[in-house]
């Protein structure tokens, strides 16, 4: 169970537990609801499980940037595209731990370490494990995204103190091969299974704005809602088009469609932390407020998300103050 979920009061809410038997048609039907009805339903679900005035604040650090052999069409870190991004070596553990300490001092409660790899190599495991254990010792919730994992690697990361492992599905299965060809959908599902079997929490979501249809978005959420366990953390990214990538000229998704994505995610995965990930830099405070109303309860803080910009700390502090929201208490 997500440690941040608050107890349910059976006198006030439907005691039914989250479902794992959603059909694609049911998820599509949620997307088709009138906007205000959908947001109202999502807000009701949100209040069953969480304090709607609280936000979890996460910070993300790229511990190894660029040079990835994959061809994910949205990503600046692929070596297959000319994006002008210089590849870097894996950071030293001490550097990462110092960055995590700074993040905690700035208000972050969760620290995620990302490496631009297709898969984790055993030779890198000791250094990654040192990063994780050092960040964990600071009292932060730990997350990593390092590509595909074997069962033994997942167990080693768990032993090092990793709380969450991020491995996104990106989009629905019917649209996936239009975005990525170097890794199959099943590859991603297999890594998620290894993470679950190792006893770690899963962080898994996707991206909107890649040219997909509403049915494709429903397909992604249907996949997540029918996993053996819902993702403990569910990030939704609004594509930040990167010049030089195949999706560099993508048109922005309608803002209300992004809110619909948040709302449906909250309804079908009611106990997940639903995170607004990439894309907040170009969102108005009104749009973000709608997302929080629709069930988003986590954001990334810090001026950089891997290779894209994110709102400055002062902007986020002003946003929370304007909305009278507060950072989520540490579990």
From Swiss-Prot:
The gene is bioB. Keywords: 2Fe-2S, 4Fe-4S, Biotin biosynthesis, Iron, Iron-sulfur, Metal-binding, S-adenosyl-L-methionine, Transferase. Signal peptide: none annotated. [2Fe-2S] cluster binds at residues 112, 143, 203, 275. It catalyses: (4R,5S)-dethiobiotin + (sulfur carrier)-SH + 2 reduced [2Fe-2S]-[ferredoxin] + 2 S-adenosyl-L-methionine = (sulfur carrier)-H + biotin + 2 5'-deoxyadenosine + 2 L-methionine + 2 oxidized [2Fe-2S]-[ferredoxin]. GO terms for molecular function: 2 iron, 2 sulfur cluster binding; 4 iron, 4 sulfur cluster binding; biotin synthase activity; iron ion binding. The lineage of its organism: Bacteria, Pseudomonadati, Pseudomonadota, Alphaproteobacteria, Caulobacterales. Pfam families: BATS, Radical_SAM. One of its GO terms (biological process) is biotin biosynthetic process. Its EC number is 2.8.1.6. Residues 53-271 form the Radical SAM core domain. Its cofactor is [4Fe-4S] cluster; [2Fe-2S] cluster. SUPFAM superfamilies: Radical SAM enzymes. Disulfide bonds: none annotated. It comes from Phenylobacterium zucineum (strain HLK1). [4Fe-4S] cluster binds at residues 68, 72, 75. Homodimer. Belongs to the radical SAM superfamily. Biotin synthase family. This is Biotin synthase.
């Amino acid at each position: 169970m997500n440690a941040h979920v608050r107890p349910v009061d059976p006198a006030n809410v439907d005691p039914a537990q989250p479902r794992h038997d959603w059909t694609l048609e049911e998820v599509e039907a949620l997307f088709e609801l009138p906007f205000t009805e959908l947001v109202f339903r999502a807000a009701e679900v949100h209040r069953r499980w969480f304090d709607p005035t609280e936000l979890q604040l996460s910070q993300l650090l790229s511990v190894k940037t660029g040079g990835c052999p994959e061809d994910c069409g949205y990503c600046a870190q692929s070596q297959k595209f000319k994006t002008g991004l210089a590849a870097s070596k894996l950071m030293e553990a001490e550097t990462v731990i110092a960055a995590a300490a700074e993040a905690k001092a700035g208000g972050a409660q969760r620290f995620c370490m990302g490496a631009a790899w297709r898969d984790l190599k055993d030779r890198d495991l000791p250094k990654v494990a040192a990063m994780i254990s050092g960040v964990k010792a600071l009292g932060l919730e730990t997350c990593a995204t390092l590509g595909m994992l074997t069962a033994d690697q997942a167990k080693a990361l768990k032993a090092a103190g990793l709380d969450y492992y991020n491995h996104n599905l990106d989009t629905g299965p019917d649209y996936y091969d239009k975005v990525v060809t170097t890794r199959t959908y099943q590859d991603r599902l297999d890594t998620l299974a290894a993470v679950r079997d190792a006893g770690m929490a899963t962080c898994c979501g996707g991206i909107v704005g890649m040219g997909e249809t509403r049915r494709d978005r429903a397909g992604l959420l249907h996949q997540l809602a029918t996993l053996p366990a819902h993702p403990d953390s569910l990030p939704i990214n609004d594509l930040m088009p990167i010049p030089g990538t195949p999706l560099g000229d993508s048109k922005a998704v309608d803002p209300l469609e992004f809110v619909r994505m948040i709302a449906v995610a909250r309804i079908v995965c009611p106990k997940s932390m639903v995170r607004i990930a990439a894309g907040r830099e170009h969102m108005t405070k009104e749009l973000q407020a709608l997302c929080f109303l629709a069930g988003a309860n986590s954001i990334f803080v810090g001026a950089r998300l891997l290779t894209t910009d994110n709102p400055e700390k002062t902007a986020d502090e002003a946003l929370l103050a304007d909305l009278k929201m507060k950072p989520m208490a540490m579990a």
